[in-house]
């Protein structure tokens, strides 16, 4: 039973933590801390973590995810430049926002450059040229990435 009508009870706190665990953006630290809280079953600790600890854990997980992009061979110049700027700024809110929307946009720009490089090769087949142009015509981040990861290998 909640001590106040506005405060979530223990079951509400557990549900909130389980929802965080179900989020694919939850990294290792968030997962580790959330599981430990569920195991301990301490409503006050859960409340405190949801109020402040979760943001701290998510910020660390976001920093790790962003840093890993530096080692990813698919990360092009725009992604790397934006990652370095984010790491220099050290703003956890900016990192979260970039992971949610900015990364997709930066990767799409890098993918457009990669496809343009493929098209610049005069020895590619007409089918590969058509598939590359179709990806550029579609111009969605998903179509560009799909062409680079799958589509270019499916044409003769």
Question: What are the language-model segments listed below?
Answer:
Residues 1-156:
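Extended, compositionally biased repeat/scaffold regions that form elongated interaction surfaces
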């Amino acid at each position: 039973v909640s001590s106040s009508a506005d405060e979530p009870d223990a079951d509400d706190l557990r549900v909130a933590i389980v929802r965080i665990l179900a989020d694919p953006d939850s990294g290792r630290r968030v997962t580790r801390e959330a599981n430990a809280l569920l195991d301990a079953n301490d409503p006050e600790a859960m409340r405190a973590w949801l109020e402040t600890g979760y943001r701290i854990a998510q910020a660390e997980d976001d920093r790790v995810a962003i840093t890993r992009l530096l080692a990813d061979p698919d990360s092009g110049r725009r992604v790397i430049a934006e990652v370095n700027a984010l790491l220099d700024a050290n703003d956890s809110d900016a990192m979260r926002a970039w992971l949610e929307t900015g990364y997709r946009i930066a990767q799409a720009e890098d993918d457009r450059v990669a496809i343009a490089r493929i098209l610049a090769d005069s020895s590619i087949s007409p089918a590969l040229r058509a598939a590359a142009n179709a990806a550029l015509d579609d111009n969605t981040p998903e179509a560009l990435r799909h062409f680079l990861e799958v589509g270019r290998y499916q044409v003769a």
